[in-house]
């Protein structure tokens, strides 16, 4: 068996990636979220596959087909709620994974980091098109508002929007193509995940101390396979509690009303995991400016490897940048809260302040604190 594992062309790759992989001996539970994201992706693909067997992507029957899944399909309600809440768990793990990368300076592995950001954007696109599929009120109006943003692009904007819609409004053609995108994108994500892992295993994993750990490595199996299994157990417990006891707590009640183009909901808002970006979008009065700020709110993560001037790796021994980091986290929570509030005073002003603070922390405060800490080390 050992000879097969180490010599077989296919098993050899698996062996070098998950069994005999030399791993730093001191990586903490914050490093569990990569495997949890892999687990989330598998859950989403499997539940999505079973939902796709019963779902119809036609405007007249889409809403009814989701109701049919919940009422008539064996455990359809469970599959649907596991899929909906699985997306929330996916994004919770994703945010923690990115947050850990920033805290411990994992962005110095720039290839892995940049592929990770592309993965983040692809996951956001998948979640957006997926939210449109049940064809409730918030699905329809969310799709209308977000796709309409593309009309802000000079010259080609209006044509581009009509091309994506497949007509002059969000309708049957839009829903059909969104179902197709939602089906294909998870497999594209899976391909990117493999590239992400490929780049990670080229350099080896980062660790909490930020020091080179080549002198102190242990095999991935059994130490970290057991650790990951514990994390997966916690994840599945949380997901089952959400799906069985609070299935609609993270959803929008408006989505239980069938889509009606003649009736606009009072507050159009996306799912909770997009609210921080939505708040940044709304805080800029200009349409094109808002769209650019929305894009930059994610793409700014690519600036971390470029803006890093610190002599130390990670924030574990850097109290000034550490404080700024936690202010950034608090700021993101404020943005998430503002994104779900109506567009009125004082929420608009809080959103504008939080948006400016978000960009200022990453582009100004963190690089400045890096320089200050470098000078303190010299003293």
Swiss-Prot record:
This is Cytochrome b. Heme b b566 binds at residues 97, 196. Heme 1 (or BL or b562) is low-potential and absorbs at about 562 nm, and heme 2 (or BH or b566) is high-potential and absorbs at about 566 nm. It holds the Pfam family Cytochrome_B. One of its GO terms (cellular component) is mitochondrial inner membrane. The cytochrome bc1 complex contains 11 subunits: 3 respiratory subunits (MT-CYB, CYC1 and UQCRFS1), 2 core proteins (UQCRC1 and UQCRC2) and 6 low-molecular weight proteins (UQCRH/QCR6, UQCRB/QCR7, UQCRQ/QCR8, UQCR10/QCR9, UQCR11/QCR10 and a cleavage product of UQCRFS1). This cytochrome bc1 complex then forms a dimer. Component of the ubiquinol-cytochrome c reductase complex (complex III or cytochrome b-c1 complex) that is part of the mitochondrial respiratory chain. The b-c1 complex mediates electron transfer from ubiquinol to cytochrome c. Contributes to the generation of a proton gradient across the mitochondrial membrane that is then used for ATP synthesis. Heme b b562 binds at residues 83, 182. Belongs to the cytochrome b family. It comes from Akodon molinae (Molina's grass mouse). Its cofactor is heme b. Keywords: Electron transport, Heme, Iron, Membrane, Metal-binding, Mitochondrion, Mitochondrion inner membrane, Respiratory chain, Transmembrane, Transmembrane helix, Transport, Ubiquinone. It is found in: Mitochondrion inner membrane. The chain crosses the membrane at residues 33-53, 77-98, 113-133, 178-198, 226-246, 288-308, 320-340, 347-367. GO terms for molecular function: metal ion binding; ubiquinol-cytochrome-c reductase activity.
């Amino acid at each position: 068996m050992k000879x097969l594992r180490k010599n077989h062309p296919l098993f050899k790759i698996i062996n070098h990636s998950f069994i005999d992989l030399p791993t730093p001996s001191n990586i903490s539970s914050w490093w569990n979220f990569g495997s949890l994201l892999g687990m989330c992706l598998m859950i989403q693909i499997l539940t999505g596959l079973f939902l796709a067997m019963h779902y119809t992507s036609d405007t007249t029957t889409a809403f009814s087909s989701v109701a049919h899944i919940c009422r008539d399909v064996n455990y359809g309600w469970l599959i649907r709620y596991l899929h909906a809440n699985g997306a929330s768990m996916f994004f919770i793990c994703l945010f923690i994974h990115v947050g850990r990368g920033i805290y411990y300076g994992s962005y110095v592995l720039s290839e892995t980091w940049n592929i990770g950001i592309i993965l983040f954007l692809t996951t956001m696109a998948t979640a957006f098109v997926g939210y449109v599929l049940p064809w409730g009120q918030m699905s329809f109006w969310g799709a209308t508002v977000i796709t309409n943003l593309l009309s802000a692009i000079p010259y080609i904007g209006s044509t581009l929007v009509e091309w994506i819609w497949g007509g002059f409004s969000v309708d049957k053609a839009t829903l059909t193509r969104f179902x197709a995108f939602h089906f294909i994108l998870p497999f594209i994500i899976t391909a990117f995940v493999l590239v992400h892992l490929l780049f990670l295993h080229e350099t080896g994993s980062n660790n909490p101390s930020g020091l080179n750990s080549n002198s102190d490595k242990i095999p991935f199996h059994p130490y970290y396979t057991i650790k990951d299994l514990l994390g997966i157990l916690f994840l599945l417990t949380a997901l089952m509690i959400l799906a069985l006891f609070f299935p609609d707590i993270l959803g929008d009640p408006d989505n239980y009303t069938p889509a009606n183009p003649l009736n606009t909901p009072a507050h159009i808002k996306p799912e909770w995991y997009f609210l921080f970006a939505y708040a940044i979008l709304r805080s800029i009065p200009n349409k094109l400016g808002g769209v650019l700020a929305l894009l930059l709110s994610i793409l700014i993560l690519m600036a971390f490897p470029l803006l890093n001037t610190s002599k130390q790796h990670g924030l574990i021994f850097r109290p000034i940048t550490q404080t700024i980091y936690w202010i950034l986290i608090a700021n993101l929570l404020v943005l998430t809260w503002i994104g779900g509030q109506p567009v009125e005073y004082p929420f608009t002003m809080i959103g504008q302040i939080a948006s400016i603070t978000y960009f200022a922390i990453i582009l100004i405060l963190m690089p400045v604190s890096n320089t200050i800490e470098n000078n303190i080390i010299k003293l």
